[in-house]
């Protein structure tokens, strides 16, 4: 009986240590990558478009390995090609054509997978794989199109980035420290209501701080936008957890230390 109790205590201690280490990795990742991203965002232009495209390519790579159980060329080739064309079209000031290219790449991937299905597929990635190209395309087009505004583009990118990062870090930290009722246990066994509220508070504080420092006077409106963005960030996190559960994966990727994708 004593050995059983000791092993349970040891397991809980190891879990807490692992959670603390994960939080440290998240903070370190943000501290290292954050300034780099913001410097490139401040510079803008082709360099920032390239950074966004590289990030979107990473998103597509991890998504494809998750939903197709491999680096499926039927998804990656048309997906990477669509991102490349979107990059060029954004750079020559054709955002509508860039967006259209993402959907063309998604449709092409679906057609290729329908025409050449795997004989014994472990999974059927047609819908999930083609939607992943749209998902990655949004990850590229969102920040790239925001930054095109020469007057407020950098502030907009800074607002979104800091709101999202603060939401993620505060939700994780507050949830781990306070615990409490789970937000949606069927989807995620770790996310709590306390963490969700903490994430919203942190996200709104970060977003309004950016606006205040940038001389924006409509702070109430900015706070509402930051609140909505924080909620959407956490909803996206829950969606990712649902996808991971759907495909039996613990993490969706490992490109950024401390983040499961």
Predicted regions and their residues:
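Interfacial loop-to-transmembrane junctions
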Residues: 246-261
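A short local structural element in Rossmann-fold oxidoreductases
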Residues: 170, 240, 244
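Membrane-embedded alpha-helical bundles of polytopic integral membrane proteins
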Residues: 2-228
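Re-entrant/interfacial helical elements at transmembrane boundaries that shape
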Residues: 176-177, 243-246
């Amino acid at each position: 009986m004593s050995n059983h109790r000791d092993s349970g205590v040891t397991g809980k201690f190891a879990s807490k240590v692992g959670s603390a280490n994960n939080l440290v990795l998240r903070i370190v990742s943000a501290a290292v990558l954050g300034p780099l991203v913001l410097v490139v965002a401040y510079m803008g232009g082709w360099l920032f478009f390239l950074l966004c495209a590289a990030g979107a390519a990473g998103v597509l790579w991890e998504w494809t390995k998750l939903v197709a159980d491999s680096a499926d060329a039927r998804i990656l080739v048309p997906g990477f090609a669509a991102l490349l064309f979107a990059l060029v079209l954004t750079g020559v000031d054709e955002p509508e054509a860039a967006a259209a290219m993402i959907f063309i790449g998604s449709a092409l991937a679906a057609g290729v997978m329908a025409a050449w299905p795997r004989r014994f597929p472990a999974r059927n990635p047609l819908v999930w794989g083609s939607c992943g190209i749209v998902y990655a395309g949004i990850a590229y087009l969102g920040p790239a199109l925001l930054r095109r505004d020469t007057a407020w583009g950098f502030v907009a990118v800074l607002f979104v980035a800091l709101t999202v990062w603060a939401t993620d870090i505060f939700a994780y930290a507050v949830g781990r420290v306070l615990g409490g009722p789970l937000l949606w246990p069927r989807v995620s066994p770790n996310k709590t209501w306390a963490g969700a509220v903490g994430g919203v508070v942190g996200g709104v504080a970060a977003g309004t701080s950016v606006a205040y420092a940038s001389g924006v006077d409509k702070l109430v409106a900015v706070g509402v936008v930051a609140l909505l963005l924080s909620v959407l960030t956490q909803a996206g996190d829950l969606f990712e957890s649902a996808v991971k559960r759907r495909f039996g994966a613990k993490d969706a990727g490992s490109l950024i230390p401390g983040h499961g994708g």
